[in-house]
Amino acid sequence: LIVPHTLCNVENPSTEIEFAGEKLSSPIIMAPVAAHKLANEQGEVATARGVHEFGSLYTTSSYSTVDLPEISEALQGTPHWFQFYFSKDDGINRHIMDRVKAEGYKAIVLTADATVGGNREVDKRNGFVFPVGMPIVEEYLPEGAGKSMDFVYKSAKQRLSPRDVEFIAEYSGLPVYVKGPQCREDVERSLAAGASGIWVTNHGGRQIDGGPAAFDSLQEVAEAVDRRVPIVFDSGVRRGQHVFKALASGADLVAIGRPVIYGLALGGSVGVRQVFEHLNAELKTVMQLSGAQTIEDVKHFKLRHNPYNPTFPVDPRDLKLY
C-alpha cells in the first residue's frame, strides 16, 4: 500500500530522469517484445517511432520482425538496448553482437529465464505459426524454420552459465543486464559474473506456470542488489500506481510490453506514444497524491505490506450462490 505524505509541494512533479548518462522523459521504458508485425504492418518501426516521440528507452527483441538498421533509423538516436537469446553457436553470438554494436546499442539484455518455450497448448491446438519473419535470427535457422518458435528455441543455448555473462561483456564491451533473476542466489551469481544490471521479470507469466509474480520477487532482489547495480522491472504493469510501487520497491526503470502492443495495434506509432503518455500521466497523479515531486522521491517511499490471509468457507452453503 502507498502511504501518502501531506503538506508537500507537488505543484509540478517531474518524471524526468538521467540513467547511464542518458536523459529520459520517464523511468517507463519499452520492454523487449517479439513480432510487432503481428499487431501492425509497420511492426517495430512504428513502435520505435512512438518511443522516440515519448523520449524514453527502447529494448529490441532478438525476435523482432524488422531488422536492426530499420529500427535504429526509426529511433533517431533514442537510447536503445538489445535483448539477447543466446545461441548454442558462439559464431552466431559474435556476429549478432557485432551488428548490435554497429547500430549503436547501449547495453545487452541476456534473457536467462526462457531458454526453452513454455507449453502453449492453445497455440498447439490452433497450429499457430508466425506469418512474418524474424530477420535478426532467421538467417541462422534451417529453411522455413522462422515460421515456428520450436525451431527458434532449439537453436537457443540451454546450458547458460555465469561464463556466458562474462563472454558477452568481454566480447561486446557493453553493459550486460541479466533478465530473469528472482532470488538472492541468482542475483549474486549474476553480479559475480560481471552483470551491470538485473532485470526482474517472470516473462509476463507466459513461460513457467506457477512461478511467483515478478513484483513479489522485486523486494528480495532489491535487497540482494543493495544499490550495487541498476534494477529494471517488468511483468504485469498496467497502471501508473504499478510503476510507482515498483520504483518504491527498488526498481530504477519499469518496462512495459503488452500495453504498448495494444496501442500499436490500435494506432501505430501514435498509439504507442499515447500508451506511454497515459501511464506517465497516471504516474504523475499518483506522485502528487502521495507527496512526491521527483522520481528520486518515489524511490525513497516506504510501502506498507499488509499480510494476505484469505479464508475459505468449509460449508458450500456459505458461498451463497443462490
Regions found by a protein language model. Give the residues of each.
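Glycine-rich active-site/cofactor-binding loop and its immediate structural neighborhood
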Residues: L24-V66
